[in-house]
Amino acid sequence: MMAKKVYNHDDGVRLARYRDDFEHASVYGKWRLCWKSKDLENHAHKVYAIYSYGSHFPMYVWDELSGQWLGNSDKYSRTTSTHQSKYRPSEVAKWFGTAELCSIIDCGLVGYITNRMEQGLPVS
């Protein structure tokens, strides 16, 4: 599916609420296929991520399997903080740092938790 070009944040926020792919000059949202899910090898698992100024800073992630919004607790810039406020979903189940949220995009929430447990790391 091709991302819808939007020219104002209000349209972007509306599309993000419906988890539609969109592109704005500084914010975009798109579905991603989780590719590192060992525990879900035979199942298609997707997440919807909303980014500010590139894929290095995901603001929010919808995990399709758990049916939850996950948020980025880190701050990046004043403009990105404005984006985080504007695009914030009505309910965020859990907050993660940028690196953790990027890992969740790669393998989904279940894959992320499984990987942490296998490495003997705490799951908070």
Regions found by a protein language model. Give the residues of each.
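Terminal leader/tail segments of proteins
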Residues: M1-S124
